[in-house]
Curated annotation (Swiss-Prot):
Induction: By heavy metal stress conditions, in response to Cu(2+). The keyword Signal applies. InterPro entries: GH25_Enzymes (IPR051595), Glyco_hydro_25 (IPR002053), Glycoside_hydrolase_SF (IPR017853). Keywords: Signal, Stress response. It comes from the Eukaryota. The gene is lys-3. One of its GO terms (molecular function) is lysozyme activity. Plays a role in the stress response to heavy metals such as copper, probably in a kgb-1-dependent manner. Disruption phenotype: RNAi-mediated knockdown results in partial sensitivity to Cu(2+) ions with less than 70% of animals reaching adulthood 4 days after egg laying. Residues 1-15 form the signal peptide. This is Lysozyme-like protein 3. Belongs to the glycosyl hydrolase 25 family. GO terms for biological process: cell wall macromolecule catabolic process; innate immune response; peptidoglycan catabolic process; signal transduction; stress response to copper ion.
């Protein structure tokens, strides 16, 4: 079974490579994970187990759906497999925080593959507060690159995890996050934050004074792997920061699925809008034409 190069867990996407921590002294010790690790396709990792199958009676539930988050190259067959296993969407990383940050072109490939498989797509970014780019510039970098490559994004999720990566005074961190939220809204995007109670408290001090229309995608696992999964519902959510309800929950991390190592998520489907082709008029000199774009982003709308 092939395994891809990836960020093993979304909760630690831009620290330097580190060994797995086998002795976790407290519940959030799982933040000390492998990051940016290349996994040899022929290397057997016995501790990474196959993800449990989604029960058949939940694969077309009118109330909730399952998703995975991805930060690596995919193939059309990968997306077909996810669809056949009952998954409805993928969260795709579009900003790589390594160095000065750069647009992750793997996102284009995955969004197109997901669209062809009939899956929805959501875009998330892993920002870097130490980059010379401002928070607004990091949002703009992703937005402009997606648009230039035929992707019309409606919403964006901002990762706020791994406190050790946020090397700046707390006031600077808050302003950086606020700058990203403001920039995304100025571009007409809906905004979500990927975090947890612990991450949010450590990084922002529990900041709760921004707009309540920012969605929440929270993670809650007991440890990496299938044995560390929590229930695939949002019923364990407890209010923190400005949020009184959550939109998405990550309940499993570092699990084998369709030849990939992924994290698993669940979300309410009440208002979900799947990816679709949209048409835009483009007015050029002495002519008018139409441009087709894949529209992504719709969970929580």
């Amino acid at each position: 079974m092939k395994l891809f190069a990836l960020l093993v867990s979304i909760t630690l996407c831009y620290s330097f490579p580190a060994p797995l921590q086998t002795n976790v002294s407290e519940p959030f010790g799982l933040l000390q994970k492998v990051s940016e690790q290349v996994i040899d396709p022929d290397y057997n990792i016995p501790e990474v187990k196959d993800a449990p199958a989604i029960p058949y009676d939940e694969r077309n539930s009118p109330t909730h759906a399952y998703s995975v988050d991805i930060s690596f190259h995919t193939t059309p067959s990968d997306m077909d497999c996810l669809r056949d296993q009952g998954y409805k969407s993928v969260f795709v990383r579009a900003l790589n925080p390594i160095g000065n940050t750069y647009f992750d072109r793997n996102a284009l490939n995955t969004i197109n593959n997901a669209f062809e498989a009939g899956l929805g797509s959501e875009v998330y970014i892993t920002p870097n507060i130490n980059s010379t780019r401002s928070g607004a510039d990091q949002i703009s970098l992703v937005y402009q690159n997606l648009l230039a490559n035929g992707i019309n994004v409606r919403s964006i999720w901002i990762q706020v995890t791994s406190p050790t990566n946020w090397v700046a005074p707390m006031a600077v961190r808050i302003e950086f996050i606020q700058d990203m939220i403001r920039s995304a809204k100025n571009l007409g995007l809906s905004v979500g934050i990927y975090t947890s109670f612990y991450d949010w408290l450590e990084i922002t001090g529990g900041w709760n004074t921004f707009s309540s229309d920012v969605f929440l995608w929270y993670w809650h696992v007991l440890s990496m792997g299938t044995d560390g999964e929590t229930t695939p519902t949002l019923e364990d959510f407890r209010p923190f920061g400005p949020w009184r309800q959550a939109t998405v929950k990550q309940f499993g991390q570092v699990e084998k699925l369709c030849g990939m190592i992924v994290n698993r998520n669940v979300y309410s489907t009440g208002n979900q809008h799947l990816s679709q082709i949209v048409h835009f008029s483009t007015h050029q000199e002495n002519s008018s034409s139409e441009k087709k774009l894949i529209r992504v982003g719709g969970i929580g709308f």
